Swiss-Prot record:
It comes from Arabidopsis thaliana (Mouse-ear cress). It is found in: Plastid, Chloroplast thylakoid membrane. F-type ATPases have 2 components, CF(1) - the catalytic core - and CF(0) - the membrane proton channel. CF(1) has five subunits: alpha(3), beta(3), gamma(1), delta(1), epsilon(1). CF(0) has three main subunits: a, b and c. GO terms for cellular component: chloroplast; chloroplast envelope; chloroplast thylakoid; chloroplast thylakoid membrane; plastid; proton-transporting ATP synthase complex; thylakoid. Keywords: Acetylation, ATP synthesis, CF(1), Chloroplast, Hydrogen ion transport, Ion transport, Membrane, Plastid, Thylakoid, Transport. It is a peripheral membrane protein. GO terms for molecular function: ATP binding; mRNA binding; proton-transporting ATP synthase activity, rotational mechanism. This is ATP synthase epsilon chain, chloroplastic. It holds the Pfam family ATP-synt_DE. The gene is atpE. The keyword tRNA-binding does not apply. Its main location: plastid.
């Protein structure tokens, strides 16, 4: 049995195809979804989406949003998403280093929160390259 997975951002459809299984980062931890999963709506955290096709796993960096699962349909709406194959390793590493530097020099609560979020996004992109 398969699931139909659709990953959407405000600007584009990132993925729309059948899959065997996914592992999704939610605000309360990771969940695995197979065919005939119980219906659920959940917040999606900044993190990795693992997608299993027949015998192959793919990864995607997700930048927060929400997901709806039901009737073997998974719709994930996120602020941004990148397949690991679309991420430039050098650019991702450079962005991570900049985010770490910005966090070190952040002043005040607002700057610190924004710098932490940027760092989480940068780490997720690097992690997507190194997962599976």
């Amino acid at each position: 049995m398969t699931l139909n997975l659709c990953v959407l951002t405000p600007n584009r459809i990132v993925w729309d195809s059948e899959v065997k299984e996914i592992i999704l980062s939610t605000n309360s931890g990771q969940i695995g979804v197979l065919a005939n999963h119980a219906p659920i709506a959940t917040a999606v955290d900044i993190g990795i989406l693992k997608i299993r096709l027949a015998n192959q796993w793919l990864t995607m960096a997700l930048m927060g949003g929400f997901a709806r699962i039901g009737n073997n349909e998974i719709t994930i709406l996120v602020n941004d998403a990148e397949k690991n194959s679309d991420i430039d390793p050098q650019e991702a590493q450079q962005t991570l280093e900049i985010a770490e530097a910005n966090l070190r020099k952040a002043e005040g609560k607002r700057q610190t929160i924004e710098a932490n979020l940027a760092l989480r996004r940068a780490r997720t992109r690097v992690e997507a390259l190194n997962t599976i």
